[in-house]
Amino acid sequence: MKAVSRVHITPHMHWDREWYFTTEESRILLVNNMEEILCRLEQDNEYKYYVLDGQTAILEDYFAVKPENKDRVKKQVEAGKLIIGPWYTQTDTTIVSAESIVRNLMYGMRDCLAFGEPMKIGYLPDSFGMSGQLPHIYNGFGITRTMFWRGCSERHGTDKTEFLWQSSDGSEVTAQVLPLGYAIGKYLPADENGLRKRLDSYFDVLEKASVTKEILLPNGHDQMPLQQNIFEVMDKLREIYPQRKFVMSRFEEVFEKIEAQRDNLATLKGEFIDGKYMRVHRTIGSTRMDIKIAHARIENKIVNLLEPLATLAWTLGFEYHHGLLEKMWKEILKNHAHDSIGCCCSDKVHREIVARFELAEDMADNLIRFYMRKIADNMPQSDADKLVLFNLMPWPREEVINTTVRLRASQFNLRDDRGQPVPYFIRHAREIDPGLIDRQIVHYGNYDPFMEFDIQINQIVPSMGYRTLYIEANQPGNVIAAKSDAEGILENAFWQIALNEDGSLQLVDKDSGVRYDRVLQIEESSDDGDEYDYSPAKEEWVITAANAKPQCDIIHEAWQSRAVIRYDMAVPLNLSERSARQSTGRVGVVLVVTLSHNSRRIDVDINLDNQADDHRLRVLVPTPFNTDSVLADTQFGSLTRPVNDSAMNNWQQEGWKEAPVPVWNMLNYVALQEGRNGMAVFSEGLREFEVIGEEKKTFAITLLRGVGLLGKEDLLLRPGRPSGIKMPVPDSQLRGLLSCRLSLLSYTGTPTAAGVAQQARAWLTPVQCYNKIPWDVMKLNKAGFNVPESYSLLKMPPVGCLISALKKAEDRQEVILRLFNPAESATCDATVAFSREVISCSETMMDEHITTEENQGSNLSGPFLPGQSRTFSYRLA
């Protein structure tokens, strides 16, 4: 009799390092479970495989306390029995950056090679939805297979669990969906009644959905020890289901069967974030916004600032500190695990997540300062007071720069490398204790104070490089006064901005004549959800600052003006007060709106003082545009999403596990457009948005979501059981202060032609400044060589392709440059001009393995497809 299906039983564990329990609690279980796993693999030849959840952080946690077992692990990996990798941690894919996903795979696969070969499957059994760019990233590591659970439904193009999945550039993987999850084979009973009760309905679903009738029954669960009697269970399965064949397999064997039927597979494209058959938690992007903001800020510091700066320094002769960078990367990658960055954890775990981010940020800040200092210390005029300006974007930038200089003088002159005076504006000045500069000064009895000047300058800084200004103490400088010709509260060549009575803004784009009104109005509403999902209260009451009485202070400086808008919102203290239409709670709002004299951007800092619970705060940016779609960036590209999800009309009748609310994630920017005119909103960490309004559309950017439970049952937008467990998490109410920032950019034409992606990256990559003075708390010896006073490593146009990463190669003396095309539909070429002679240029995989022959020069062949990244390795003279 031909088998109805072949059922592949794969022993595994899903290992959340932390969740409602801490890493240290799970580590104790890990030590226990690993001993059982190793003993079974060593002693039982029939127990062929064990999958270690696709992440090497498990091994790192284990070896921290059991280093003596490295050889035991290595033997089992080399034998193909213990299956490890390819990830470092089980990452989220919708709210972390492209480079974070790339480094997660890079470090995970490099860790694997110390023990054997990694599993070459993009294995994400529990992440909350799948980015449409994952096939492209997987291919960059030679991975052509993926296995996941969440996000698919038949509206993507098939109701089958096996298909081909493509990214926008055509990168392709073979996909196997786990339609009932990764734990349907957990704790399998050994008796017939128990097995039939569990599996009869499962087999019907699995076989109906399968093209190949190769069925997966993963034998494992969260923190589950291996099932000792699995062979007894398999014998019972063969007895009660004789029409099916049961085998112990590794996932690769299933994919071999799928790939043999490639011609029968549908081809799907795009992201998978449907919660029809399983929960994807579309609104988890706004939980614990303090952590989300820190995460984005530190990602940007490492990728946009530190790595390019370290590369500049390396090309000048200084050491590239791979070990320090790997340490900080791994700290934040631990936080990128889906539960951790989703922030659906206990308060104690969230405190540990914050601590890891603080450690990584402290390392990044100090290493940035170290590299700037090494460069400044080793210029020809090394003892002179200097201000060194670093531009880590690949085109020259004229920027208004706010920075601080310290010196032992009450006045100073600032000059450039040609001896010309540099005008500057003094924003603030204060005395500081000399011990804060260098404790050795006061150690020898010198207590004369230093002066600290916060200054503003307007300078052009070379592309991917730096320039030096010189500080002459006790000399009169070209100090200029504040200027303003504004008719409204703020004005420059591009914008006229006025204040409404409720504290919101009226904007006029002078070039296009387009008007925007009620911009930056704060909206407050209920949140009866949990750490996984937003859900409104049954008795909703939406409040805006319409009755606020704002106080507005205007500060005009030399090249920049700011409006500081302050007001309080009276809001319900909790859900009970909202139901009773009472409002004894309070949200303090301080908006700082900054307009530079030569900028199309309006930069906004939002400072909140939240003194209420169970609510959501959003900032609204109304536009005059009537459109049914919105553009947002994603990893290595951008995509258009509908303003409204049509599935919302019938989601309850169709039995969705959660409502398909049109609340989406971005990474750095989102844009609305009608005709040739558009408005983009840039953000750092505010990665959740919705577009609301009937005709004229409004951006609604989530600022804060306060909830008090990790999991909660029977939400309006997510009926049924709690996600996670019903654990109190008072810290997730986010009482107290929260600061965030965004920027508004108007443009004409397409987002691609206007360089919206490039402008967002530039906003997230501010010019860095280093003030070199003769004293420093920490001493450094000088290098045995000098560096130039001005330097530019490379140059690219401010449109077209965009840099994703600039770093030194991990294993050779070359520069790695990863570029991508951010456009959704247009191809583009890349032009890179190095200031140094290029001995050779090779194209590589994302793992930095060379794939093409070396070419002389820096010319890059062929156009970049939409959403395509390419990685190049340069050997410089």
From Swiss-Prot:
Catalytic positions are D126
SUPFAM superfamilies this protein is in?
A: Families 57/38 glycoside transferase middle domain (SSF88688), Galactose mutarotase-like (SSF74650), Glycoside hydrolase/deacetylase (SSF88713)
Question: What note does UniProt attach to the cofactor annotation?
Answer: Binds 1 divalent metal cation per subunit.
Is Transferase included in the keywords of this UniProt record? no
Q: What is its EC number?
A: 3.2.1.-
Q: Where does a divalent metal cation bind?
A: H14, D16, D126, H338
Q: Which cofactor does it need?
A: a divalent metal cation
One biological process term in Gene Ontology: mannose metabolic process
Which catalytic reaction applies to this protein?
Answer: (2R)-2-O-(6-phospho-alpha-D-mannosyl)-glycerate + H2O = alpha-D-mannose 6-phosphate + (R)-glycerate
Ubl conjugation among keywords: no
Q: Looking at its record, which EC class is this enzyme?
A: hydrolase
Recorded hits in Pfam families, A to Z, give: Alpha-mann_mid (PF09261), Glyco_hydro38C2 (PF17677), Glyco_hydro_38C (PF07748), Glyco_hydro_38N (PF01074)
Q: Name one GO molecular function term.
A: carbohydrate binding
Similarity annotation? Belongs to the glycosyl hydrolase 38 family.
Designated name of the protein: Mannosylglycerate hydrolase
